[in-house]
Amino acid sequence: AGYSDFDFQSLSSKKRVYVENDANCAAWAEHEIGASKGMPNSIMITLGTGVGGGIILNNKLFKGKSGAAGEMHFKMYPDRRRKCTCGAYDCFESYASGTGLKKTGEEMSKNPDITTYDIVEGMQKGDKLMTDIFNTWQDHILAGLIGLTDLFDPDCIVLSGSMAQFVDTDYLEQKTNEEIIVRSLKQPSCVKVDIDGNSINYTIEKELGIELVGDIKMK
């Protein structure tokens, strides 16, 4: 569900009202005071139950023609038939999210009751099957990062959210840059995890709300 052409300001006569996508707020937070500070071009991806994202181009939040730029629902694979929460099939979110990790675990273990906790704990303890499941999930993330890097040529991709703490950023960065450098003269991009992203995002939404959702920094 969503709102279009709704006058939120009419709900409050005393305070100015600003409405913005939370992932866009997070992307701007990282750009202003977080892991991608000082980098004019960056992509922020939140890995949680779902996947969110925001794109900074030339120091401006890029929103696209309808405000939907940065939604991580681009199609990953043909005919895999994994249904996404958006209703489509085989979106990046359906593979790269925590929900996607569970689904990958179900498929590889043949256990419908497996949880993300089971997989991460097993991987950390050296269980081979759980490690294989986790690595498969991480490679789904990698495929998305390679595509985004080819499209936007960012200085950095920042991963945040509850699942980001478990990924191997050195592996993701190395493999992403191997793919793009062998096919072009692009400079390498960095991949970072911001484990303090939630507190940073809250601060930026509170302190820089006017700058964030006004016309000052928007494209």
Regions found by a protein language model. Give the residues of each.
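Adenine-nucleotide phosphate-binding core of ATP-dependent small-molecule kinases
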Residues: 92-95, 102-170, 188-197
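Glycine-rich phosphate-binding loop of actin/hexokinase-like ATP-binding domains
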Residues: 37-95
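Generic structural signal for well-ordered alpha-helical scaffold segments
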Residues: 28-33, 135-149, 177, 206
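Conserved phosphate-binding/catalytic loops in two-lobed NTP-binding clefts
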Residues: 13-20, 116, 169-203, 210-219
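Glycine-rich phosphate-binding loop plus the immediately following alpha-helix
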Residues: 13-23, 77-112
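Short, active-site-adjacent cap segments at secondary-structure transitions
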Residues: 25-27, 52, 164-167, 200
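Glycine-rich phosphate-binding loop and adjoining helix at the ATP-binding site
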Residues: 1-41, 168-178, 183
